[in-house]
UniProtKB/Swiss-Prot annotation:
PANTHER family linked to this entry: GLUTAMATE--TRNA LIGASE (PTHR43311), GLUTAMATE--TRNA LIGASE, MITOCHONDRIAL-RELATED (PTHR43311:SF2)
Assembly mode: Monomer.
Gene (name only): gltX2
Pfam family, one: tRNA-synt_1c
Cell compartment(s), UniProt: Cytoplasm
Lineage: Bacteria, Pseudomonadati, Pseudomonadota, Alphaproteobacteria, Rickettsiales
Protein name: Glutamate--tRNA ligase 2
GO terms assigned for molecular function: ATP binding; glutamate-tRNA ligase activity; tRNA binding
EC class name: ligase
Naturally occurring in which organism (per UniProt): Rickettsia canadensis (strain McKiel)
Annotated keywords: Aminoacyl-tRNA synthetase, ATP-binding, Cytoplasm, Ligase, Nucleotide-binding, Protein biosynthesis
EC number: 6.1.1.17
Primary role: Catalyzes the attachment of glutamate to tRNA(Glu) in a two-step reaction: glutamate is first activated by ATP to form Glu-AMP and then transferred to the acceptor end of tRNA(Glu).
Amino acid sequence: MTKVITRFAPSPTGMLHVGNIRVALLNWLYAKKHNGQFILRFDDTDLERSKQEYKNAIEEDLKFLKINWDQTFNQLSRLSRYDVIKKLLLDKKRLYTCYETPEELELKRKVQLSKGLPPIYDRASLNLTTEQIKKYIEQGRKPHYRFLVNHELISWHDMIKGEVKYDGKALSDPIVIRADGSMTYMLCSVIDDIDYDITHIIRGEDHVGNTAIQIQMFEALNKIPPVFGHLSLIINKDEKISKRIGGFEIATLRKQIGLEAMAIASFFSLLGSSSQILPYKNMDELATQFEISNFSKSPTMYQPEDLVRLNHKLLISVDFDEVKERLKEIDATYIDENFWLSVRPNLQKLRDVKDWWDICNQTPNVENLNLDKEYLKQAAELLPQGEITKDSWRIWTKEITNITSRKGKELFLPLRLALTGRESGPEIAGILPLIDRKEIIKRLT
């Protein structure tokens, strides 16, 4: 059986966002599931927009999510190889030169759209005479190159969408080499996939048209195309996710919002599938349950609050030994196991533990809360004597009920507000032993 090899091919022109990290995760998990290899390729042929700092940031995000790669390379290092294939396809008459300026092409596009026609290149350059070409060269025009798409049926079995068919007539011949000599994504991606023996490609359904063209490129080079799978797009409030929509970058999720790596990985690996979205502890567990066949063809709604809830579920199950090193990262080495176990059920993000430490160790400002001072004074007098334990809360509130007849919210909420300054949070039974007895009396009176 052929060894499974997948790849993730980001362009270092911006930060990773939730759409392309989902693609990275699924390609990595598919390779892991089948004991294969995962390759990281940087599509950096856009010389103007590609930046080293984006490449570094992409690698940092992938490492944070424990997405490790077996090989990595960038396309700029392979220009001589692309040139060989360029000459081969020119000889096969599957590449042809064009001399239109960007302004001329834009005008053609606008005219087609105004007539209700799709903006498909008219192949005018195929009919240029030798004299016309000579004139363009004398004008200083440099050619760009297009791939000639055969006007025939293109079909493949998609891992997610099932049978997909495309009419070659509906596809525009893509520019594969720009006038400045730089390569576009289309052809060099195919060359890389051939040379690195890529067997499976999972990507967004916005690439379906590209896939149809690239299948012809594989065939023009006498190679069998990889198996493709096209994911439904992630949408948020009726617009697809892209790196141009702010707030969805992985760096934002992990640095500014403070989400756990496995919460992010679990969520986006399962989003859009029939599998229940659960917080997995590690990537090996996630790979074990991963099934590409579980993914839906329908668009997938991304609600950021669902991700935060999953992060909460993950933290609830994290033992103190697992989190000790992480506490060092957020300068919270003063947190001990008892405190962690007490506040863990109410943490949305790890750094929230510092807020709860402050609540327990710093008197909250309750001046504007309009507290029932007489009731709180009475409650202070009823606080059980001796050491404060987890049983103290039960004993204390029972005695308060006996004396005041208060129950439920009428009993609990004033105590919570006075002790924590908040209407909700960890169980008071858990944090009460963490507050010094004198401090409890002080907050109540």
